[in-house]
Amino acid sequence: DVALESPFNKGLRYGGASISVDNLELYIAAQNPTAAFPENIDLFMTQYEVLDRDDDGNYLYLWGALKPLENLNSASGWEAQPALSSDGKQLYFASVNEQSLVDASGNRTMDIWMSERTEDGDWGPAELLPRPINSTSNDKAPFLHPDGNTLYFSSDRSPSGGGYDIWYCHRDSTGRWEDAKNLGAPINTDGDEHGLVVSTDGEEAFFASRRTGTKGLDLLRFPVPEEFKPEEVRIVKGTLQATDGGIPPGAKLYLQYAKSKRIETIEINEDDGRFASIVRLDQGEDVLLISEAEGLAFQASVVVDIEQTPPNSDALVAPIVLQQPLNGEAFEIGDIQYASNSAEIGRTSIIILEAFASYLTRNEALGVHIIGHTDDVGAERENQVLSERRALAVATALANYGVPVARITSQGLGESYPLAPNIDATSRSINRRTEFEITLKN
């Protein structure tokens, strides 16, 4: 284990850290003594800031100063155990304050609260989560899974095996929290269990427990039972930049669910172009990652293909580089694929072309010239014809999705303009491509 350096661990008590899905924002609880309340614990946040770039162009980072969450901290209360939602818009935490619920003896209990991020990036007033999450017992240590709808927390309410137990609560499609469920034995015991976190793929959980056989408070793990699993999600992450290596001003990045056309905007870090987002897999839809910027080329790729079993690992997207399409240079849109030795466009490629057609119809001054290329496998004349048929198939698809035919042209260049020597399967895959040239129409 390595202790974090400044601004952490500067002599006071720290704990309960929660980090954003892009790893650039961290929330933590720390002792913040006041004259009236020396043991006061408050919530703080810090950002992972770009300090400089080295000689190779790599970014150097540093955690910024801890900033107290003034709207959430109370002078005479206790705020700790933060849990940031995967979209960065909600912050859950535990607190004992003047508005807390009271038990049968009239004592204030530990409760779970939630704050919404405002448009200016600050945190709004905290709200006490409703029953069945909070009770007149002590409820603490919230963990909201990246699916955004599954909350795990610790409580000493009944029924209980004794001490604090881990509980599960799911939010339905209407936003209502369903009945909370105790995870039961052997996860919960007559000791204390709390601090549970669940992996993004929902398969494994980690928690702290003080039970028979442990040496005090120890860390344990277990496979998540089916009835307590969160919804299926994956993390999509990468970087976006222009060809000059800078961050395109006004660049837009979003997820589009192919069937419902639902759009989810992804925030791009202005310093280094990094991004990360959660993609829902339970919708039964293909999902596109689309990037646009004024004056720069459209790009899209399929990050969820419903005909393939989603991998458990995160989806690390190759760096997105937006080219300048109006300087006479051709550009590629990733994942435009065809059946072998055919002009039949692949299923997911059709989805990408539909999104590209939408982009062109929104930008009426733009035309597009489509260029087909092949590798050198087969006869040169056959490759020439195949490239023409593939380019025409793409042109037809764009027209079918509403782009006026007058704004579309196409040609095939066969194997005449390879990007790499045709020496192996990898180089040939580079040469089999469809390029696009954007033109300005009068």
Language-model features: locations:
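Short, conserved micro-motifs composed of acidic
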Residues: 1-239, 243-249, 265, 269, ...
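Solvent-exposed, polar/charged alpha-helical surfaces in well-ordered, non-transmembrane soluble domains
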Residues: 6, 21-24, 67, 86-89, ...
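Loop/turn elements at helix/coil->beta-strand transitions in domains of secreted/extracellular proteins
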Residues: 24, 89, 149, 363-367, ...
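Structural recognition of the beta-strand scaffold that forms the well-ordered cores
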Residues: 83, 197, 337, 344, ...
